[in-house]
C-alpha cells in the first residue's frame, strides 16, 4: 500500500468522522458550529485529495477505493445526524432518498465492474453538482445559526435529492442494456 499526500488526506477525512460525531453531541452552544466546521474541513479534503492525486499523478488503487468510501461514510453519518436532530419528514425524506441512491449506485458499479464495464457507470458532472449541493446543505443544517440558514439548507437538501434521483436515472440508463440482458 502506497501512502502519498492525497491518500493521507483521505485517511484524515476518515479520522475526522468520529470527532465530527462527538462534537455534534457535545452539550455546549458552540457544538453546531464546530461540527459544521469539522464537516466542511472533511468535505474540502474530499475535493482536494482527488485534485492532488490527478495533478501530481499520484492516483493509487487504495486511494481510488478509500476516497468514495470515506465520502459516503461521512455524508451518510452527517445525514443521519441531521435527520435525528430535525425529526421531520422534510429532512428525513431527502436523506433517505440520497442514502438509498448511494447504495443502489454502489451495487450497480460493483456489478458493472464484474462485467468489465465499470467505465459505463463512471461519475458524471451531475453527480459532482449533487455532491456539492449535499455538502453545502449538510453544512448549513449542521450549523443552523438562524432559521433562514436552516430554510436554505433544507431547500438545498431537496435540490440535492432531486439531483440524486436525476444522476441515478443517468447511471441506470447507462447500464440499461446490461441490466435487461442479464
Swiss-Prot record:
GO molecular function: CDP-diacylglycerol-glycerol-3-phosphate 3-phosphatidyltransferase activity
UniProt keyword annotations, A-Z: Cell inner membrane, Cell membrane, Lipid biosynthesis, Lipid metabolism, Membrane, Phospholipid biosynthesis, Phospholipid metabolism, Transferase, Transmembrane, Transmembrane helix
EC number of the protein: 2.7.8.5
GO BP: phosphatidylglycerol biosynthetic process
GO cellular component terms attached to this protein's record: plasma membrane
Gene3D superfamilies per record: 1.20.120.1760
Residues that span the membrane, as ranges: 13-37, 61-81, 87-107, 146-168
Membrane topology: Multi-pass membrane protein
Function as written in the Swiss-Prot or TrEMBL entry: Catalyzes the conversion of cytidine diphosphate diacylglycerol (CDP-DG) and glycerol 3-phosphate into phosphatidylglycerol. Essential for the synthesis of anionic phospholipids, thereby playing a role in balancing the ratio of zwitterionic and anionic phospholipids, which is thought to be important for normal membrane function.
Database matches in HAMAP family: PgsA
The protein's name in its UniProt record: CDP-diacylglycerol--glycerol-3-phosphate 3-phosphatidyltransferase
Organism of origin: Shigella flexneri
